[in-house]
Amino acid sequence: MKDIYISGFADEISSSFDEQLKTVRELGMQYISLRSADKKGIADFTVEEVKTDLLPRLQAAGVGVSSSGSPIGKVKIDDEEGFEKQCAQLETLCEIAKLLDCKYIRMFSFFMPEGKDPADYRDAVIEKLRKFIAIAEKHDVILMHENEKDIYGDVLSRCVDLMQTLNSAHFKSAFDFANFVQCGEDTAKCWDALRPYIVYIHIKDAVSTDKENVLCGTGEGKIPELLHKAIVEEGYTGFLTLEPHLVLFDSLQSLETTDAKNIIRENKYKNGAEGYAAQYHALCDILAKF
């Protein structure tokens, strides 16, 4: 399909970067979203480490990087030390992105205190995001806000608020079907409201009954119909990025505030490579019908 590229969070295949690249190439994929490699998160790499270690392996495999799967913004809103650390990490991540010829960095809008009204923290969220955006503007990189669970921008109304208020060419939306399902939202309404800001799509599905992730197209994310709308009717071009969450993987615990086993209660495939391949083929089957 012209101008549609399938990428994915390859650390769901294996913690080994070589195994990630091997599986990706066997599937015929040419891109990954770089979240972690060899059990090390992308935000913990130096520019030199990426240049001398990861980049040569990417080039040898013929694999490009669609986005940096960073943890930026995945700290508590009142964690000032954590925020300052992430500002420094974002500077490095922007330099890494340029080295990898990658213009997108995935990020979040801060964890809210449990039991508190997110509206009480809106001003603090906006202020801190403006600082992140200023760094991105300096490096000409685009920050993509993912509608992650339990952050300020986890529901539609607050996602729209962020996009409209910040109104920056360097702050856009990475649309995640499953997260909206798990937050009780209608993905079709979310798509329509956020469409002017969406530059990237995560392929992850879920059901609302137990909030479990399921193979794409089999849950309540309305992935087939919304991808058809996006690509065929609206002319979306760019990346569709696999994030299966069908098998427990090493880096998951570092991404979540709860026990990883509460996120993926049971492995739906025998290993990460099999689950990743299943998600890839399910997406290809959806696209083949367009």
Predicted features by range, described:
Residues 33, 67-69, 106, 144, ...:
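Conserved beta-strand positions in the central sheet of alpha/beta enzyme cores
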Residues 38-43, 74-79, 113-118, 182-183, ...:
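A short acidic, helix-capping loop that chelates divalent metal ions and anchors anionic groups
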Residues 16-22, 59-60, 64, 76-173, ...:
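Active-site acidic/histidine proton-transfer and metal-coordination neighborhood
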Residues 9-13, 35-39, 70-73, 110-112, ...:
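Active-site beta-loop-alpha junctions enriched in small/polar residues
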Residues 6-18, 44-54, 85-90:
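N-terminal-biased segments
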Residues 33-55, 59, 110-116, 211:
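Glycine-rich, proline-tolerant flexible connector loops at the mouths of alpha/beta enzymes
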Residues 2-10, 59, 64:
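Mobile, glycine- and charge-enriched loop segments
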Residues 1-7, 14-28, 101, 156-175, ...:
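Histidine-acidic metal/acid-base catalytic patches
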